[in-house]
Swiss-Prot record:
Catalytic class of the enzyme: lyase
SUPFAM superfamilies registered for this protein in UniProt: Tryptophan synthase beta subunit-like PLP-dependent enzymes (SSF53686)
Gene from which the chain derives: trpB
UniProt protein name: Tryptophan synthase beta chain
GO molecular function annotation: tryptophan synthase activity
Family in the record: Belongs to the TrpB family.
Source organism: Staphylococcus aureus (strain bovine RF122 / ET3-1)
InterPro entries: Trp_synth_b_CS, Trp_synth_beta, Trp_synth_beta/beta-like, TrpB-like_PALP, TrpB-like_PALP_sf
Subunit-structure text: Tetramer of two alpha and two beta chains.
Enzyme Commission numbers on file: 4.2.1.20
């Protein structure tokens, strides 16, 4: 494995040609302050101890790495292990990062938080830590996503957050990020922007990756204990890329195949997809250079996915770099493929995954049968499907699948 891979952003915040700090001058002092504070916190054993305490006692880590016996047998190939991020408090991987950033904000003396959310999982995780640490929180959420995720909106409000509907654009995650950044610019003195994915201006991609890499670190020690070796392949779904980068990062320099699964929406040959790598090109959005779905004129296009957490038109800078150097292979799953995998997996394993995670499972169902029974695949179940029950029910009813 090539040991020359760049695994940290350079001084200007770039991974290869991706990343950077494309923000208005007014935000630069806050970005510089954040970078300095994070560097100090990262090197402070007391901060790390506090983070570990809350991850263990509040979030419920370590999450299990479960051998999926029935699923493995049904696919007839490689052994499949599930990294159970769905078992975290709040039901997804998002809490790992929300908790870390809230502790960082507290350390910086910030009393208020602002966040964006798509599926509502990052919003719920942010509202949870805001309640825990007695901080105010404003969450921006696209109006379209609010319709899809009523239950999560109620959860956030119950936890004390103020949820603001974003009507601009398509009313989804990308528009919510725009609004959250604008809000941060005008409230920068007392507010920390709790960004939920591995994107945005440097140092956000690094901060989010570091707080999420607990996933991959745990996988590494767990699989060595269970199998005495590293897996042959690791699979994770990709929207902005936080669960995937957290899963992959500890394995970047190991001889392990890494697969990121993007949302192909209604299909690669339509314009209703979220294939930033598959059909995009490099561009700048939300403060960073990364792969984006855009037209020839550089206009960012609307992303589509049945999963509210994957309909983002970009993919974080570190993933963009790993794609260019060939370290991570990007595959995709359509809405239909993801939903079929969700139904199949649930019937075999008794676990209802989030629709996001089902995109990764769809690729596992294609990959596993091509591998030998001695091979090992680890797939990250990034979240549980509770938030998606209405979407799943509707999908199955429309197709007459309800009683299959």
């Amino acid at each position: 494995m090539n040991k020359q891979i760049q695994t940290e952003a350079d001084e200007l915040g770039f991974f290869g040609e991706y990343g950077g700090q494309y923000v208005p001058e007014t935000l630069m002092p806050a970005i510089i302050e954040l970078k300095k504070a994070y560097k100090e916190a990262k090197a402070d054993p007391e901060f790390q101890r506090e983070l570990e305490y809350y991850l263990s006692e509040y979030v419920g880590r370590t999450t299990p790495l479960t051998y999926a016996a029935s699923y493995t047998e049904s696919l007839g190939g490689a052994k499949i292990y599930l990294k159970r991020e769905d078992l975290n408090h709040t039901g997804a991987h998002k809490i790992n990062n929300a908790l870390g950033q809230a502790l960082l904000a507290k350390r910086m003396g910030k009393k208020k938080l602002v966040a964006e959310t798509g599926a509502g999982q990052h919003g719920v995780a942010s509202a949870t830590v805001a309640a825990l640490f007695d901080m105010e929180l404003v969450v921006f959420m696209g109006s379209e996503d609010i319709k899809r995720q009523q239950l999560n909106v109620f959860r956030m409000e119950l936890l004390g957050a103020k949820v603001v509907a974003v009507e601009d654009g398509q009313g989804t995650l990308s528009d919510a990020v725009n609004k959250a950044l604008q809000y941060w610019v005008s409230h920068v003195d007392d507010t920390h922007y709790l960004l939920g994915s591995a994107l945005g201006p440097d140092p956000f991609p690094t901060i989010v990756r570091d707080f999420q890499s607990v996933i991959g670190k745990e996988i590494k020690s767990q699989i060595l204990k269970k199998e005495g070796r590293l897996p042959d392949a690791i699979v994770a779904c990709i929207g902005g890329g936080s669960n995937a980068i957290g899963t992959f990062y500890p394995f970047i320099k190991d001889d392990v195949a890494l697969y990121g699964v993007e949302a192909a929406g209604q299909g690669e040959d339509t314009d209703k997809h979220a294939l930033a790598i598959g059909k995009g090109s490099p561009g700048v959005l939300h403060g960073t250079k990364m792969y984006l779905i855009q037209d020839e004129g550089g206009q960012v296009q609307l992303a589509h996915s049945i999963s509210a957490g994957l309909d983002y038109p970009g993919i974080g800078p570190e993933h963009s770099y790993y794609h260019d150097i060939g370290r991570v292979t990007f595959e995709n799953a359509s809405d239909t493929q993801a939903m079929n995998a969700l139904i199949n997996f649930t019937k075999h394993e008794g676990t209802i995954p989030a629709i996001e995670s089902a995109h990764a499972l769809s690729y596992v169902e294609r990959l596993a049968p091509t591998m030998s029974k001695e091979d090992i695949i680890v797939v990250t179940i990034s979240g549980r499907g509770d938030k998606d029950m209405e979407t799943i029910r509707q999908y199955m009813a429309e197709r007459g699948l309800a009683n299959d």
